[in-house]
UniProtKB/Swiss-Prot annotation:
Gene it is expressed from: greA
InterPro entries xref list: GreA/GreB_C_sf, TF_GreA/GreB_CS, Tscrpt_elong_fac_GreA, Tscrpt_elong_fac_GreA/B, Tscrpt_elong_fac_GreA/B_C, Tscrpt_elong_fac_GreA/B_fam, Tscrpt_elong_fac_GreA/B_N, Tscrpt_elong_fac_GreA/B_N_sf
Name recorded for this polypeptide: Transcription elongation factor GreA
Highest taxon of source: Bacteria
Recorded coiled-coil stretches: 53-73
Nucleotide-binding found in the keyword field: no
Family: Belongs to the GreA/GreB family.
Species lineage: Bacteria, Pseudomonadati, Planctomycetota, Planctomycetia, Pirellulales
An example Gene Ontology molecular-function term: DNA binding
Keyword DNA-binding: yes
Gene3D superfamilies on file: Transcription elongation factor, GreA/GreB, C-terminal domain (3.10.50.30), Transcription elongation factor, GreA/GreB, N-terminal domain (1.10.287.180)
Listed GO biological process terms: DNA-templated transcription elongation; regulation of DNA-templated transcription elongation
Protein's job: Necessary for efficient RNA polymerase transcription elongation past template-encoded arresting sites. The arresting sites in DNA have the property of trapping a certain fraction of elongating RNA polymerases that pass through, resulting in locked ternary complexes. Cleavage of the nascent transcript by cleavage factors such as GreA or GreB allows the resumption of elongation from the new 3'terminus. GreA releases sequences of 2 to 3 nucleotides.
Keyword tags: Coiled coil, DNA-binding, Transcription, Transcription regulation
Length: 159
């Protein structure tokens, strides 16, 4: 079964723009560099040629990965989701039960994630551990170091 990738319309558009940029700006530059390197002669020992071919392959892999996300995209209308539990699009304030630290996360879809600003993928193990919880409940999240417990303090929507 193909797993859908939840995202907002903005996240979808951001990924489409990134694909467009890669295909229409980066790829032509790499193709040009390959052509220039090919003109230098013997391809067997042409390091520049091989490096650019490798760059081309890596860029194509990135493009294909983003195309796959777009193909499996499920655009979510955040305004239709429940407001009393942790769901896609909400900002949740949690307390680490073990240490008492408060943290805030926004659960987002592909294309919107930004871990430095607390925007985490709803499909990540951490995001999945929080989904469905209500204020006052405790979420257990599996991480490589073991299980972490977080108490849900506040759920907000920035619509």
């Amino acid at each position: 079964m193909v797993e859908s990738v939840p995202m907002t319309r903005e996240g979808y558009n951001k990924i489409k723009a990134e694909i467009n940029r890669m295909e229409n700006e980066e790829m032509p530059m790499i193709v040009q560099k390959i052509a220039e390197a090919r003109e230098e002669g013997d391809l067997k020992e042409n390091a520049e040629y091989h490096a650019q071919r490798e760059n081309q392959g890596m860029l194509m892999a990135k493009i294909n990965e983003l195309r796959d996300k777009i193909a499996r995209a499920s655009i979510i209308d955040v305004s239709s989701l429940p407001k009393d539990e942790v769901v896609f699009g909400c900002t949740v304030t949690v307390e680490d039960v073990a240490y008492g630290d408060e943290e805030q996360f926004t659960l987002v879809g592909a294309g919107d994630e930004d871990y430095d600003s607390g925007k985490i993928l709803v499909t990540s193990p951490f995001g999945q551990g929080l989904v469905g919880k209500k204020v006052g409940e405790t979420a257990e999240v599996d991480v490589p170091a073991g299980k972490l417990k977080f108490k849900i303090l506040k759920i907000e929507f920035n619509l």
